[in-house]
Every structure is written in C-alpha cells, then in structure tokens.
C-alpha cells in the first residue's frame, strides 16, 4: 500500500542517482572523488556477515561474543567475525552510506520503518558458514546459503518496487551488489572424501562457478546491473592451515591451488555471463588471491608486522583454538593481517583490501576498476 513517504523517497532516490560525492567540500580526499551509489547490497559468508547468524538459533557459526567487536564502536560484538568493521562496512563508508544492517534484523512488525529505510540504502544478506551450494550449511548446523540470500533480497526488492517505477529502476541500476563467497564450498571439498570421489578439483570448481552464475542471473533479473565480485583468497595461508603444516608454518599450497582453479573458472563465467546478458551487466572482479599474496609477501609495505598468526586465539600461531572470550588477544590489532585461525581479516586488513579495490589501475581488478564501475 502506498504511503505518504513515497513521493519523498522517489525524489530522494532520483537525487542520489544523479549526485556525486565530490559536490561536497571536504569529502573529496576521503572518497577520492568516487561517484555516488544509492545503495549497497551484500551477499556472502563470514567475511562480510554483519550479524545475520545471531538470529539463527541452532547455528554454531556465530561471533556475537568477545573478543569479537573489541574495536567496534562501544566495543560491541555484533556478529562480525572481526575485531571491528569488516570489508562490507568499509565499502559502505567509502561511499558515504550507512552500514548495511543484517537482513534478519529487519523482520517483524516493529521493524517495518527500519526495513523501508534499509531497502533504500542497502542490506547485508551474508551469513557465516554460507556457500554457493545449498549443502554448505550442514557442517556448521545452520547458515543461509546463497540461494536463500537471494530469496531474502527479493523480499527487500519488493520494498524498492513500491517506489515510483522510474525511481526504482534508477535505484537498482545504480546500486552496487557485492558478492563474497566460495571459501566454505572449498573447505567442504577439502574435508569430504565423498565430494572428492564424485568430482575432481576442476569439475568441482566449475560447478561452483555455474551455480554462482544461476544466482547472479536471479539478482540481475530483479533489475541489478552493477556487481562487485570478490574472488577467493589464499585460504591455504590462514593461521589454522599454517599451524597444521609442519614446523615451518608454510602455506598449504594444495588448498591454494584449488582456490586458483575456482578463481579461473569464476573469471571465465563472468565473461560468459556478460555475453549472454548482452552487456546489460557491468562488473568488477577483484582478485583477492593476488591482493593477499602481495600483502603476505611484503607486509611492511601495507603496514603489517604479522601476516602468519592469528590476533585472537591460543596455541601455535595463536591458531589452535577459535577466538573465544578466554582467548589470547594481540595488543596491536592494526599490525595483524588475520583476526582468527580461520583467516578472517582484522579491520585494518579489511580496510587495506578495500583501498586496493579502489585503486585506479587494474592490477587487482578486471575488466574495469571499482571506481570505473560506479561511474558507469
């Protein structure tokens, strides 16, 4: 049912779609003259989960307890697998948007107005433990796989479509849809003899790319046009993997090889998808594998002193146990690349990675940079 707020929101969206942040004095240096985006919608796993798993009663993949959130405003553990804000938050801040709230926090009659507002500026659908395949949530008890995250987006999409049609279309075409997923599917493959018997690494990673393609099409069909797709990082270099890999604490290159295979399949899939959709989709693929490799190879260049151990944990490389309330906490989180044994980045690392996304060259981004993407 239309409300009295509809005309205002229509004008507001049209305004956002045409506005550039460099129109505001003093914001130029902070944003690097970024073009504005009206909304940020986030899909993925624990790398960008803002607290959706807090609302899943039987999920064991949660971060709503200390030391998580030790550097978040008010030192609040929000459900982010991080000491502070994650990469999705950093992207929102770069574009001057509010932090996208977790989708599950917007349910219920008392949250109706908050839901309407979030539908305009962005929502976070990501879930710790989620994967591209629907089966990825079985190991951790409960998560929201990508297909269900897209279902949740479609319910938010209904709120957007209550606006005047041209404003809704403009909003969808100018917003940024960010996807960060795939690591848990690979972890499942490493740990499952059944999966390895059913398919070789090339077949499995190609199937991952094919299934992701199906979900990207669903989002595109709803009116989305701009996508930021983030590849899988070197999960063989997480503190947990290093701690198990001999006394030298080297990366697990076998695991890294599978990450490379998936990223190669992902890049080819995105190229094919653009052709199939006759150019109606515009995307930036960010090579997170390469960015993490460069940070680990030259940590001082990026401001880090420790790129092997976890900031929060216990034991060898602080990676024998998860980040629990009684875990050992590093004193300077700004110097650590990894927050915990699973390889979640610290807030400092997340911000560094987002800065690399926003560089003007294509060393990490293809076929265009993120700054070019939001200017199209």
Swiss-Prot record:
Class of this enzyme: hydrolase
Single GO molecular function: lipase activity
Residues of this chain annotated as glycosylated in UniProt: 134, 245
GO biological process: lipid catabolic process
Stretches assigned to coiled coil: none
This enzyme's EC code(s): 3.1.1.-
UniProt protein name: GDSL esterase/lipase At5g55050
The organism of origin for this protein: Arabidopsis thaliana
